[in-house]
Amino acid sequence: AVDWVRGMDALLNRVGNNADLRILLFTLDESTYARELAPMAGHWPCLRIGPPWWFHDSPAGIERYFNQVVETAGYYNLAGFNDDTRAFMSIPARHDVWRRGVALHLAGQIDKGYFGRSDAEHLAQLLAVELARDAYGLIP
C-alpha cells in the first residue's frame, strides 16, 4: 500500500505551500481518498485530487469519490475530469458519465439543503470545465 503522507512529506514540506504549483494526485485505491488525499489537499495549496480513474469512473464510483473527498477537501481542491483512455471513441461517453455524476451529486447537495441551485450551477461549471483547466494550467 502507498503511504501518501510519509511518501510526500519531504516534497510537500519544501513546495507544498506554493499556490502557483500544481501537483495532482491519482490513485486506484479508493480507501486513500478520505483517509489521506482529501486531508492533504485540504491542507497543502499545491495539491489537487485527480478524478476517479479506471475502476472508479462509473456512476457508482463517481458518487463514492464525491462522498469521500468533498467534505474534507472541498470542491476547489479537485482537478475536475480528464481522460487518459486509449479508446478515443469512448471519450464523449466517459465525460458524459462524469457530468451526469456531477449533476446527481449536486442535486443531492441541494436536496439536503447544503446550497442552492445557483451555487450548484456554478459548481457544475467548475467541475465540468474550469477545475481541469486550472489544474493543468490551460487558463491563460
Question: Language model features by range: what are they?
Answer:
Residues 29-33, 55-56:
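Short, catalytically relevant binding-site loops at active-site mouths
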